[in-house]
């Protein structure tokens, strides 16, 4: 499939899930909005779950660039800021919340693929930090990202709280420096 056509299909899929939720998403609706025949869509993706799963991972709408600021702290602040923007600024916030909330009720969506893909790219931050001596070998990069990204999800999505511009810096400081003061 031509990259432009695929992009149009994915964009239509994500816009529709943001507008109507997963239950209102149909391959027919995607076909109509993207201008592609539904049989073409089914040829590439056998179900709406497969289509949405592919769109979540491959679309530029939810994409991100892995930062390389030269320090673990700087890279983590940039990653957390990216998650904050994703979950608080449309259209990403509408798409992410609708699609990933649906994944809880519809295991066929395989939301794990979205998170696995993101972490596979985020891993480079930790590999560089380890080479620079900023991260002990015992550190668990997945746990670090879960703590940081999870904090944004809790505040922005589950609690409906405003996540300010300084949130990323504060969250990273707590994770890297801890809250315990010796003595």
Describe these PLM feature segments:
Residues 1-35, 50:
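Basic, helix-initiating cap at the start of DNA-binding domains
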Residues 34-45:
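Short hydrophobic/aromatic patch on the recognition helix
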Residues 50-59:
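Alpha-helical DNA-contacting segments of helix-turn-helix folds
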Residues 55-56, 87-109:
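Amphipathic alpha-helical segments used for helix-helix packing
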Residues 64-93, 144:
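Hydrophobic alpha-helical connector segments
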Residues 78, 120-131, 158-183:
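C-terminal peripheral helix-coil segments that are non-catalytic and often amphipathic
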Residues 100-101, 127, 136-158, 166-176:
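Hydrophobic alpha-helical segments that form the core
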Residues 107-132, 141-142:
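Amphipathic alpha-helical packing segments from all-alpha helical-bundle domains
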């Amino acid at each position: 499939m031509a990259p432009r056509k695929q992009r149009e299909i994915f964009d239509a899929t994500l816009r529709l899930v943001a507008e109507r939720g997963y239950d209102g998403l149909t391959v027919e609706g995607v076909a109509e909005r993207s201008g592609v025949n539904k049989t073409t869509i089914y040829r590439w993706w056998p179900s709406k779950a497969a289509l949405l799963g592919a769109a979540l991972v491959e679309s530029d709408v939810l994409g991100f660039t892995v930062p390389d600021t030269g320090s673990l702290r700087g890279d983590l602040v940039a990653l957390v800021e990216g998650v904050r923007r994703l979950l608080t600024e449309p259209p990403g916030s509408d798409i992410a919340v609708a699609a990933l909330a649906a994944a809880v009720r519809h295991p066929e969506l395989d939301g794990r693929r979205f998170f696995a893909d993101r972490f596979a790219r985020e891993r480079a931050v930790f590999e560089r930090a380890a080479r620079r001596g900023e991260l002990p070998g015992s550190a668990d990069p997945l746990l670090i990202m879960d703590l940081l990204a999870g904090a944004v999800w809790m505040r922005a999505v589950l609690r409906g709280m405003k996540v300010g511009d300084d949130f990323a810096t504060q969250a990273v400081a707590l994770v890297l420096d801890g809250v315990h003061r010796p003595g």
